[in-house]
Amino acid sequence: YNGLLEVYVTGFPTIHSSNNNYPVPQIMLPAQIGEVTESELVQIDNAIFVSGGSLFSGNNTYDFTSGGQSGKIYIRSNHPLIGLTIPVGPISLIGISSQYTFSVPAIDGYQILPRDTNDLIIPSGLIITSAVTQSNITSTGFDLTWITSDSSTTEANYAVSQPLTIHVNGNSYTKAHTITLTGLQPATFYFVECFSVNGTDTAFSNVGYYSTASNSTGKIRPYFNHSVDNSVSLGVDAQNITIYFNDTIKAYMDRADSTIDICVYNASDATIATAINDAYNRGVNVRYIADDDVVNSMLNSLNPNIPVVYRDPSVQGIMHNKFVIIDAHSENNSWIMSGSTNWTNPSNLFNDYNNLIFIQDQALAKAYTLEFNEMWSGVFGSNKSDNTPHKFNVNGIEIELYFSPSDNTTSKINEVIKNVNYSLEFALLSFTRDDLA
């Protein structure tokens, strides 16, 4: 099952020998890991983790690249690596070749299982010892900072697409590096690889994906369907709109000029269905992604020409998003809708305590569109990649955006918890992560 082999031993096993030496790991590239290597010890050199600088958490996979190929490791619950920093630069990665898949036949899902901290071998010499951090985000540039083990140069290669053809030199020889990218375009995403040189030794970061700020208004509008207490508000006051949740969603859809992308777990509301059909009838390009394992009765009321993609049922999990993207490529009419609300009437829209958040920001809308397009192409769950920028400057407010499971959301939440000084408040329907507890 799941590409795994279960061995059941009747009675007591026979020990033929013990205290044997471990086999020498086989050095290979990620693409060579497969059926013929399962249960064998393998080694990947020059492996660079996509999420370098974050923290390892249990029951999670982590993507890496080596030699232009991609691979995954899996960290089980209670693993010795949990809570430790994910290496930033190239390492030698050792582990047991394994597989976990829901595909039939089982021809994918290959991964490496590191046994302990000794299976991540950090090379001697110059290395990057911190995550690359983005700051001072403007519509024309941003700063990137990192730390190295020894004094070295401050450099980066970047471009809007790979290969990274533009080189910038920070002209500083130090351990604490800051480089500034300037002359960039608003609401535009850039691939950046930071690196430092000391003599003949060079340390590279993973290739990061970063966004400039947009020139949008940055309006943020939170709504709740039950009472709110604005006396404790520290920002934009929330509004209690009670029975008008569906009507509010419709009102924003009515603003769309060119595109509406909808990604919602479950829906059964006639008012919202009417808004979607009206948008399609006036020439708006509408796309809809839904989960495959719930009723979604509202979809029967949509114009049959509106394309709908259901989550791939062969991949474990559910598609639990609730977001809408309106006119993503418009500076002033781009909106994203997020929040906790499914579109089920009356349960989620009116009875259960839920919220909606609308943000007018082109950069955020374009990032949500990247995630939408990945799922629109049929990629869901553990097959997704960490392919969006994560930090945004929305009219002076820093917003971070992560999608699960590809973006190591548990690790990001854990980092926030570890940095809490005085109080932590959260509102959740379900809480099952022991590592966060």
Task: Describe each PLM feature range.
Residues 48-51, 98-103, 151, 161-164, ...:
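Acidic glycine-/aspartate-rich tracts in secreted/extracellular proteins
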